[in-house]
Structures are given as C-alpha cells and as structure tokens.
Design a protein with these regions (language model features):
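Short helix-loop capping/hinge segments that flank enzyme active sites or metal/cofactor-binding pockets
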Residues: 71-91, 250, 255-262, 315-386, ...
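Structural helix-boundary/capping segments
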Residues: 31, 35, 113, 164-271, ...
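Short alpha-helical scaffolding segments that buttress acidic/His motifs in well-ordered protein cores
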Residues: 25-29, 308-309, 355-363
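Conserved hydrophobic/aromatic pocket- or pore-lining residues that grip, position, or stack substrates
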Residues: 29, 51, 79, 111, ...
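Short, surface-exposed loop/helix-turn segments at secondary-structure junctions
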Residues: 94, 98, 239-244, 307, ...
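Short glycine/serine-rich loop/turn segments
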Residues: 71-213, 264-266, 315, 401-419
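An N-terminal boundary/leader segment
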Residues: 1-53, 289-291, 364
Length: 478
C-alpha cells in the first residue's frame, strides 16, 4: 500500500481496519519530509519525536475503540500563526523567533481530540501578509508542481505540504484569499468558511474582522471532513457562531440538479489569463451538464474590493501588531539606552518590510484627519459589497469564478511589484469583506502544467451547498 498517496479519510479507514497504523503513517510522512524539505521548504518547525509519541498514544486509543472518527491517526500540518502548546509559533517572523505558546488554538485542539497527529508548523508570509510565501523570515517555500514558482500565500507552506505529500491535510488561515489562492496555485482543495464558523482563539491576528481558519486537503471529501472536525462554538472567541448545520460531510452528494450558479462578468474581464478563463468556464460547463442552471450576471463593486481590503486589513493589523514590542516575549533589541529606543529597535529589526509597510499604511488611515477619508469610507464600501452579494444570492445558490487572475508566478517576480501582488487577490478578498464561504477546487492546468483553481462562493452559512457543487464537479472529472 502506497500510504502517501492516500487521502486523509482513506488513511484513517486503513488504520481503523488494521492495514496500517498511526505510527507507521507518521513515520512514512516524516521520512518524506526529510527527503523533500530541502527542495520545497514547507515547514518552519517539524516535531519529529513529539509526532511519533502522539501517534503511538492515538494508536492505543484506536485499538481500544476510544477513537473511531474519520481523522483518527492522520498526520496534519498547522500554519505557523496558530498557537500550539509547547511548539514554536513564529508567524514566520523574526520578532517571534523564540515564542513557544502555553496553549493551543481551538481548531488545533479540535483536531487533536479527533485523533489527528500534529507533524509541525508550516511556512507562511510573515504575519500572513503576502500572497507568495516569500515574505517569510525563514526563507521561501517552493511550489511542488514546479519548484521555480511560488506556492501562493499566505498559507503557502500548508498548501505546498499537502501537494508535496509532506502531510495528509493542513490548516491554513484566510484573511483575503490566503487559503484559496495557494490551494489554486498548488492544485489542492482549500476552503474558507463563513466568518465565525471556526474559532479564532489561538490564531495570531492579522485582520480580526476578516481572519478565518480553514482546511487545505487533497480532495473535497477530506475538506468537508476536516471542516466538520474543526468547527465548534467557542465562548473564548466573541465572533464565534452557534451553528446547528455543521454536519458538512452530509453534503458529499454528487447532485446539482436545479442548482442556480451565477458567473460574474466582472470576474472575466481585463487582466485574467486566457488559459485560466477557459479552464474555469469549462468547469462551469461540467456543472451545467450535471443539471445546474448556469448564467452570467453583473456583480458590481469588485474594483473597489482591493483598496477597501487593504485599508481595513492594514488598520486592524497596525492595532493587532502593537503588542509585539520586545517586552514580554519575542525578539528584543539589545543595548538600547532607554525603553522607547528598545521598542523602536525591536520592532524595526523584528518586522520585515511588507509587515512594516502595512503597519504604516494602517496607522496612516487611522490617524487624525484621514480616519474619515479612508477608514470610515472603506467600512461603508465594505457594507455595499456585502449588499451586492446579498442581491446576487437572492437569485443564485452559488457564484462561480476564478481564484486568481493567473497561475503561480515565478519566484521573485511578485516582490518587486507589491501593487501587482495585491492585484492578484482581486477575486478572493471581496468574499472576506462580506464574511462569505468560498472554496478553491482544481480545474485543470495551463500550458506549463501549473494548476488552475475554480472558486465557488456561497451565501453565509451555505458551506454545504459549496461542498455539494465542488464534490459533484470533482466526481464528474475523475
């Protein structure tokens, strides 16, 4: 049995049936990490001994009948902005290079309760600010589909680890597309749930009103299973929702008959690579052939999403990142003659250029004289974007479009032009602004063999509709 080629759900079944063990699966994937990390650099930290010990404990519980769930014994990777008790959590930043949390994020605890084995922490853009995983203090991650190209970001390490078979599934976070875009670039499935579905407790904040944790997996079945496992109401997160409809695996039905799918014309205009456009429209035809009703429509305000997002996210980041000052934890500059100088040097030396750029931008839009002109205006536009989606979902069950305007760019090509990098998020960020769920599903490759992702967007709390549409497409093209 080729263990590495199994999906997470298939592996858990094989462990339950005694065809392999959690320890064997963990050892196999750790050997794969040792062999492949020099090329791909998906991880910041690999907890080899801890993972094998955890796998042995999980295996005992499986054999005793105490753990019977669909992810018991499955090795997972965790994005390095989620706290993991006793394991380095750096946000891929120098300022947190020695930070070891005393607690774990709620989403990680939910995985561990289900019997998942935690392999380590994946590389990311520093503090989740970036779209290429090139702003990491710990070096770039390479795309397993072509190592000369980026894996996307900011959850690039998680997406690449799944694609490179360096884990069976991973957790990422999505503030403006940071799960869906790397999933598209690496040819895996990635889902951002409705805001408030997965607890943010233990997620080191970037943009608190936009951040959401979600799965990166090999297929849609794994995606639904992981989402079902990590979803819970959490009083420790004031934005956590109480939901009854979290049996997401019940939506794994290949049936879209009568489903109304809208394709926004605005998503297929200038700047979209023709190969991406053709692949996404071909995917829409597959769903149409399965009985879905597909039609084009106008979704206004898309052009305003980027300035709105970078105003709101930067403002929230400048506030959230104030706590990193070298006093209680993290990097502290040496030989500072007074407290103010220590703050200044610690932050100047500890944060990278992209993080500093966004902190300064956020501080500017919140400053006296500019607050009304920029920040309040952005909040008004955010409300209008939500209204535009509400109107669309009065007519359609699902909105279908591309995840990104191009396939994965070459390493180094985006950092030279931050504006170009920001424009790469044009199809994903409005979903975060509106708090909606979205999923990226592989729908082909370009002429270079680089993966293309189709994005399916749903109304609030309609993850099941998205999973049904994504599963139908996946089964139709298998």
């Amino acid at each position: 049995m080729d263990i590495l080629s199994l999906t997470a759900v298939e592996l858990a079944k094989a462990i339950r049936e005694g065809r392999t063990t959690a320890v064997e699966a963990t050892q196999v994937v750790l050997d794969r990490i040792a062999a492949a990390e020099d090329v791909y650099h998906c991880y910041v930290t690999v907890e080899r001994d801890k993972a094998l010990q955890q796998a042995a404990e999980v295996q005992k519980k499986i054999e005793a009948g105490e753990l019977t769930g669909p992810l018991a014994g499955v090795p997972f990777a965790i994005k390095d902005n989620m706290c993991t008790e006793g394991t380095l959590t750096t946000c891929s930043s120098k300022i947190l290079e020695n930070f070891i949390p005393t607690f774990s994020a709620e989403a990680v605890l939910n995985l561990e309760k289900a019997g998942a084995v935690i392999l380590g922490k994946t590389n990311m853009d520093e503090f989740a600010m970036g779209s290429t995983t090139e702003t990491s203090y710990y070096g770039v991650t390479r795309n397993p589909r072509n190592p000369e190209h980026v894996p996307g970001g900011s959850s690039g390490g998680s997406a690449a680890a799944v694609a490179a078979q360096e884990c069976f599934a991973a957790l990422g976070s999505d503030t403006g597309g940071s799960i869906r875009q790397p999933a598209s670039y690496c040819g895996v499935v990635g889902m951002k749930p409705t805001y408030g579905t997965v607890s943010r407790y233990g997620l080191i904040a970037y943009g608190s009103s936009l951040d959401q944790i979600g799965p990166l997996t090999k297929d849609v079945t794994d995606c639904a299973t992981v989402l079902e496992t990590i979803t819970s109401h959490d009083p420790k997160d004031s934005t956590s929702m109480k939901r009854e409809d979290t049996d997401f695996t019940s939506a794994l039905v290949a049936d879209v008959k009568g489903m109304k799918i809208g394709i926004p014309r605005d998503y297929f205009g200038e700047g979209l690579d023709p190969e991406v456009r053709d692949a996404v429209l071909a995917a829409a035809e597959v769903l149409k052939a399965q009985g879905a009703e597909v039609e084009e429509f106008d979704l206004s305000l898309v052009d305003y999403a980027i300035p709105t997002y970078y105003t709101i996210a930067a403002a929230e980041a400048s506030s959230n990142l104030e706590r990193f000052d070298g006093v209680k934890y993290g990097y502290r500059a040496q030989d500072a003659e007074d407290l103010h100088t220590m703050y200044k040097r610690s932050r100047s030396q500890g944060f990278g250029p992209e993080v500093k750029r966004r902190i300064m931008l956020g501080s500017f839009v919140l400053s006296s004289g500019y607050y009304d002109a920029y920040y309040l205006k952005a909040l008004r536009v955010k409300a209008l974007i939500k209204k535009a989606f509400d109107e669309a979902f009065a007519k359609y069950n699902v909105i279908l479009g591309p995840v990104a305007p191009t396939t994965a760019p070459k390493l180094g090509s985006s950092l030279a032009d931050p504006i170009k990098m920001y424009l790469g998020d044009i199809y994903t960020i409005s979903i975060n602004l509106a708090g909606l769920p979205g999923i990226s599903v592989p729908c082909g490759t370009d002429s270079q063999g680089l993966p293309i992702g189709m994005q399916l967007i749903g109304d609030c709390f309609k993850e099941k509709t998205l999973i049904r549409a994504a599963y139908t497409y996946e089964q139709s093209v298998k």
